[in-house]
């Protein structure tokens, strides 16, 4: 395990990438994390880019919160800051495993590595394990590795895992070709096996919380154990660890956003965070930053809880409210509590799925051009909170984009003219918005809610399609905590 005197900058680390999506990165990453945890290692997981779902599995497996690393939203110092904070949180990590996104070189631009997995590998001095979906290829896999190595010599491809292997002969030919033509060792052979598949959803994988609900704790754990068993049989885990130990030392971040700690003697406003099967898209760094800014976090479930807890503000993240719309509608007392809190001026911040929940109603299964949803949803309409105007329609469009926004007024996210980079990822749109509706965010990039505007507001309630990360937008936590503190103080004044 890690020597207590070893600094975070020298913790073994390794990045798992591939030539494209659907190569097996996620299940192989999960299996390797599980295998190392079973051997007693404290594994710190990371995910490149801004996905919420893969990290939910990494967190379940390792017992440590997975963190996102995004080279478009975050500068180099921000990436180092997130990495260092995560490895130091709780017990210091023994190894960091970073799962890439899409292909190794896919990113924001075609002529630079901005926002790519390769960019993260270079910033973190990380050796790369390259996963190849080897279905129907053998010798060609060597050409693939040579091409990826030569494309950017500053990215160290230190090992290969062959996935989707159909037979011993298939494995032998592909392994021999790669090692002969490239000199890169093949450290793993993963057979073609349905046990390596995780249920899909229209935004990617099924979140871990929902996986547990649908499979039951026993079935969910059995699925994860099955993946771990396949990885232990097919991959040289000791060699994987040796490669991770070869990572060069990192520099320390400067001016860490996590070093800003509120006055420990000051009263802590309580912020309710919605967390259940319907709402679970949160960056753990945001929760940490809210705590550091002085908030006490109180979790609650819009699906299961009959009433709001005693709080001074609400944070309702993204998720799949459309899949739990019947349960959310049935919990009328919770919907009424949230609407009353909004009317009373409580600061309520909602992102994407949270925004949808705060509108007047959600319609699912609506036929139309561009309909996109893998999940089977009946054609129906469900009443929601109604704290914000509008009717959420599912399935009419698919938006996946970074966005850039500017606050056009003071609000619970900060001061007028503050700007941010965020992202949006959804299959819904908000219709029937009144002409006089107010928006707090003007977008220079992205879709938003309507006509390039985002951040629909009513009083002190704000809902947006934009997802924010508190390391990229540093005013996020302090602004939301200040709004909650002001609301609490206004209620205790004589």
UniProtKB/Swiss-Prot annotation:
Other remarks in the entry: The a and c carboxylates of cobyrinate and Ni-sirohydrochlorin are activated for nucleophilic attack via formation of a phosphorylated intermediate by ATP. CbiA catalyzes first the amidation of the c-carboxylate, and then that of the a-carboxylate.
GO MF entries: ATP binding; cobyrinic acid a,c-diamide synthase activity
Protein's recorded name: Cobyrinate a,c-diamide synthase
Domain GATase cobBQ-type: 270-475
Catalysed reactions, as listed in the record: cob(II)yrinate + 2 L-glutamine + 2 ATP + 2 H2O = cob(II)yrinate a,c diamide + 2 L-glutamate + 2 ADP + 2 phosphate + 2 H(+); Ni-sirohydrochlorin + 2 L-glutamine + 2 ATP + 2 H2O = Ni-sirohydrochlorin a,c-diamide + 2 L-glutamate + 2 ADP + 2 phosphate + 2 H(+)
UniProt organism field: Methanosarcina barkeri (strain Fusaro / DSM 804)
Domain remarks: Comprises of two domains. The C-terminal domain contains the binding site for glutamine and catalyzes the hydrolysis of this substrate to glutamate and ammonia. The N-terminal domain is anticipated to bind ATP, and cobyrinate or Ni-sirohydrochlorin, and catalyzes the ultimate synthesis of the diamide product. The ammonia produced via the glutaminase domain is probably translocated to the adjacent domain via a molecular tunnel, where it reacts with an activated intermediate.
Name of the gene encoding the protein in the UniProt record: cbiA
Enzyme class, spelled out: ligase
Family that this chain belongs to: Belongs to the CobB/CbiA family.
Role noted for this protein: Catalyzes the ATP-dependent amidation of the two carboxylate groups at positions a and c of cobyrinate, using either L-glutamine or ammonia as the nitrogen source (Potential). Involved in the biosynthesis of the unique nickel-containing tetrapyrrole coenzyme F430, the prosthetic group of methyl-coenzyme M reductase (MCR), which plays a key role in methanogenesis and anaerobic methane oxidation. Catalyzes the ATP-dependent amidation of the two carboxylate groups at positions a and c of Ni-sirohydrochlorin, using L-glutamine or ammonia as the nitrogen source.
CDD domains, per the entry: CobB_N, GATase1_CobB
UniProt site positions, description: Increases nucleophilicity of active site Cys: 467
């Amino acid at each position: 395990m890690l020597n207590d005197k070893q600094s975070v900058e020298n913790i073994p680390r390794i990045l798992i990438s591939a030539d494209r999506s659907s190569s097996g990165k996620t299940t192989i990453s999960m299996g390797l994390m599980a295998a190392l945890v079973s051997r007693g290692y404290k594994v710190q997981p990371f995910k490149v880019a801004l996905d919420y779902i893969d990290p939910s599995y990494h967190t379940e497996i390792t017992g440590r919160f997975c963190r996102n690393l995004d080279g478009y939203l975050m500068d180099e110092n921000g990436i180092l800051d997130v990495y260092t904070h995560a490895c130091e949180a709780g017990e210091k990590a023994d190894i960091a495993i970073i799962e890439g996104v899409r292909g190794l070189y896919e990113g924001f631009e075609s002529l630079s590595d901005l926002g790519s997995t390769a960019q993260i590998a270079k910033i973190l001095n990380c050796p790369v394990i390259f996963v190849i979906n080897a279905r129907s290829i053998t010798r060609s896999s060597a050409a693939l590795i040579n091409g990826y190595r030569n494309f950017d010599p500053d990215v160290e491809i230190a090992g290969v895992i062959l996935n989707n292997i159909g037979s011993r002969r298939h494995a032998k030919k592909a392994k021999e070709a790669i090692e002969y033509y490239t000199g890169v060792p093949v450290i793993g052979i993963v057979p073609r096996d349905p046990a390596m598949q995780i249920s899909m959803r229209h935004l990617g994988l099924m979140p871990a919380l929902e996986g547990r609900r649908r499979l039951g704790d026993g079935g969910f754990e059995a699925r994860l154990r099955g993946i771990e068993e396949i990885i232990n049989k097919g991959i040289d885990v000791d060699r994987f660890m040796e490669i991770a130990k070869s990572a060069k030392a990192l520099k320390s971040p400067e001016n860490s956003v996590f070093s800003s700690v509120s006055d420990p003697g000051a009263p802590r406003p309580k912020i309710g965070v919605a967390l259940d099967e319907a709402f679970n898209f949160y960056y753990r760094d945001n929760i940490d930053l809210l705590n550091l800014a002085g908030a006490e976090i109180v979790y609650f479930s819009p699906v299961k809880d009959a009433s709001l807890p005693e709080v001074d503000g609400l944070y309702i993240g993204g998720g799949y409210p459309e899949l739990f719309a019947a349960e959310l509608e049935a919990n009328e007392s919770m919907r009424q509590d949230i609407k009353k809190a909004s009317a009373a001026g409580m600061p309520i911040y909602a992102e994407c799925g949270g925004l949808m929940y705060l509108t007047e109603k959600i319609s699912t299964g609506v036929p139309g051009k561009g309909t996109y949803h893998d999940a089977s949803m009946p054609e129906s309409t469900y009443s929601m909170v109604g704290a914000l105007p509008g009717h959420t329609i599912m399935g009419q469009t698919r938006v996946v984009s970074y966005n850039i926004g500017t606050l056009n007024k003071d609000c619970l996210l900060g001061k007028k003219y503050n700007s941010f980079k965020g992202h949006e990822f959804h299959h819904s749109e908000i219709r029937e918005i009144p002409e006089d509706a107010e928006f707090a965010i003007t977008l220079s990039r992205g879709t938003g809610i309507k006509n390039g505007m985002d951040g629909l507001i009513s009083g002190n309630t704000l809902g947006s399609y934009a997802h924010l990360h508190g390391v990229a937008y540093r005013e996020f936590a302090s602004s939301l905590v200040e709004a909650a503190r002001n609301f609490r103080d206004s209620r205790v004044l004589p």
